[in-house]
From Swiss-Prot:
Molecular function GO labels: 1-deoxy-D-xylulose-5-phosphate synthase activity; magnesium ion binding; thiamine pyrophosphate binding
Pathway field: Metabolic intermediate biosynthesis; 1-deoxy-D-xylulose 5-phosphate biosynthesis; 1-deoxy-D-xylulose 5-phosphate from D-glyceraldehyde 3-phosphate and pyruvate: step 1/1
UniProt family annotation: Belongs to the transketolase family. DXPS subfamily.
Protein name: 1-deoxy-D-xylulose-5-phosphate synthase
Cofactor(s) the record lists: Mg(2+); thiamine diphosphate
Residues annotated as binding Mg(2+): 151, 180
Main enzyme class: transferase
Gene label: dxs
Amino acid sequence: MTEFSKTPLLDTIRTPDDLRKLRIDQVQQVADELRLETIDAVSVTGGHFGAGLGVVELTTAIHYVFDTPRDRLIWDVGHQAYPHKILTGRRDRIRTLRTGGGLSGFTKRTESDHDPFGAGHSSTSISAGLGMAVASDLAGTKNNVIAVIGDGSISAGMAYEAMNNAGAMNSRLIVILNDNNMSIAPPVGAMSAYLSRLYSGKTYRSLREAGKQIGKHLPKLIADRAARAEEYSRGFMMGGGTLFEELGFYYVGPIDGHNLDHLLPILQNVRDADAGPFLIHVVTQKGKGYAPAEAAADKYHAVVKFDIATGTQAKTKSNAPSYQNVFGASLVKEAQKDDKIVGITAAMPSGTGIDIFEKAFPKRTFDVGIAEQHAVTFAAGLATEGFKPFCAIYSTFLQRGYDQIVHDVAIQNLPVRFAIDRAGLVGADGATHAGSFDNAYLGCLPNFVIMAASDEAELVHMVATQVAINDAPSAVRYPRGEGRGVEMPEVGIPLEIGKGRVVRQGNKIALLSFGTRLAECEKAADELATLGLSTTVADARFMKPLDVELVLKLAREHEVLITVEEGSIGGFGSHVMQTLAEHGMLDGEVRMRSLVLPDEFMDHDTPAVMYARAGLDAKGIVKKVFEALGKDKAETVKLA
């Protein structure tokens, strides 16, 4: 029996050039098939799901109307770009998404000419797009630049900085606001679509431009009032465009982002316009076309592998709690005893465990949106008034608020508590989301207390420690995922500041861990013991202030000292070496080595594979020990 393809038109498309050869009445079928393919692919690989389904029609329309990749198409964040990847020559690899050697879960310049700008973090698209548009002007190429940005991303300050700059120029920048939360505009319909098409057309724009020219010859008061009347009438009729008009954009919308009869003519009008910048306001629904995702957008924002028929996700059960949940629960316990504790997150309440705190203390919880800079200084302001703010942010996103950390927190020595989630490698999300650098970029700042939890029980105590620190900013870092399954304390007990602990005593090799690589150090010690190498394993707990007494003792009493951390060069190991150098301990007395992440941006894979490649698993630690000893490992032991 012949098996018929569920995607016959999509099967004919290798590049957007093939799409543009189709009749306009075939575009809807392409979109329908593209949605089916996206659902099927993500059910196999997992990944970001709802956002991609929400832009299927928009993606199809953009590639049909514009001459991509000559016309540049930038996806803000990039997590909604799976349909885009399918249409741009990557369908044959779409079921390798977020796997080792496979396609990235975000846009990536090295992956395709159709990805002119890489992404992962939010709110960068308009700035990058404006740069490309100005470059086109300078080069005389006059190609279009389209930046697609969500209503969450456009709330960030960088987006408004870019729009403010773009509004003062006449470059061919087209911003498409993908509004999937209805946070800006009222419901859309036929009248709105008709008006959008009318206002984006050449006739209306020509009349409007003529009106502007006439206004230049009128008394300023009359001209200003006329312009204001036109602006507000459009804002009233169209629902929400006045802000963008004030920034210098020509606003069109809102329009139904799932109706190609609305999208195609408006995109064509904007494409054929003589100047810019434009902002097209498109309203979409996350998870569109897949009932479980439509019904529970939050649960289907990002998914693991799932059954298409039922929507059931194949989540593995763990006997250990996740670090984010341990943090959230620990903060609740502390806040029950201290009404000065408040929780802050930047649009990541469930990802950081702040949602647990919010359920217990809704009035003491603040989700500031995608605004890390504001989150940090907002926390600083709370600290000046005697409150105890816990600012829970992923390591990779905390980078966005670095000047505020330095200028508003550290210099003023304000006791803001940073809970740094997703520290270290994060796996499938790759380089843009890796928490590789916080050891280095926080460790160089005066006044900070910096901790890393070696397991979930330690995290409980470190949260309690942060509560007790009232005279300095502090940070605790911990990874994504589940803990080790250790016995959990009933309550957190504040740790002695700047003091580590020895978890296993030896006399030949010393392994000093900062963070959750402690478990791999213990495995390495077991293997080294079988080879007759007595090994001490220590948990540093603190990078700053460093336990100098412990570091010097390990260096004096062992032949080899190796530091191990889930961070880049310039972090914990550098602090240890600096200390040893200042005490003359690197003058031939100890063989010191530092295990850190490679000095590169590592591509996505599973965390286990990535750490093994970095030499930060037990096997890599043992190998480093033998390199330090200077012995030929092939003669001493088979490490494979």
